[in-house]
């Protein structure tokens, strides 16, 4: 059912994928239209493409408000593994998306534990302070 949407999100046309991600994100804040897509987004968390990982993580977070079946309960541990991604942009974008998730789901303990386990030493000196700042900002909301 969502095969075409997944193709666009994961396709080689990154501009189209990014625009489509923004469109799905906006729509996800207004309706549960893409909630059923959660199960299909999950495997994308392991994509080789960093942007695909970010898009899937973020869209899954945006479904938290509609998670009447508690689908995210079975995915949250794998989602939080992205907070230790090798790409600092993935870590930063995932931390950003967690703000939305934590409004609707009580994963505070798991999220805080994952934030505390981020190894900032593996990132360049230019990125580590930015990630630390993101971590501190999210912790203030927990």
Regions found by a protein language model. Give the residues of each.
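N-terminal "cap/leader" segments of large eukaryotic alpha-helical scaffolds
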Residues: 1-25
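Eukaryotic acidic, Ser/Thr-rich intrinsically disordered low-complexity regions
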Residues: 2, 112-142
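Buried hydrophobic core positions in alpha-solenoid tandem helical repeats
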Residues: 4-6, 40-42, 72, 78-80, ...
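Short inter-helical turns and helix N-cap capping residues of alpha-solenoid HEAT/ARM repeat scaffolds
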Residues: 12-14, 48-50, 86-88, 123-124, ...
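Residue-level signature of alpha-solenoid helical repeat scaffolds
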Residues: 22-23, 58-62, 96-100, 133-137
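Flexible loop/turn segments at the boundaries of HEAT repeats in alpha-solenoid HEAT proteins
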Residues: 26-36, 64-72, 101-112, 141
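Helix-adjacent hinge/juxtasegments
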Residues: 45-85
């Amino acid at each position: 059912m969502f095969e075409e949407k997944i193709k666009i999100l994961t396709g080689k046309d990154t501009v189209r994928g990014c625009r489509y991600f923004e469109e799905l994100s906006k729509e996800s804040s207004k309706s549960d239209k893409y909630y059923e897509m959660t199960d299909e987004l999950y495997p994308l968390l392991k994509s080789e493409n960093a942007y695909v990982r970010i898009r899937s993580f973020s869209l899954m977070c945006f479904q938290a408000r509609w998670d009447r079946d508690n689908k995210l309960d079975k995915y949250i541990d794998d989602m939080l593994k992205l907070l230790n991604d090798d790409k600092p942009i993935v870590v930063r974008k995932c931390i950003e998306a967690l703000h939305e998730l934590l409004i609707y789901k009580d994963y505070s303990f798991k999220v805080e534990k994952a934030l505390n386990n981020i190894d900032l030493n593996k990132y360049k000196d230019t990125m580590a302070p930015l990630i630390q700042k993101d971590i501190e900002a999210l912790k203030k909301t927990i």
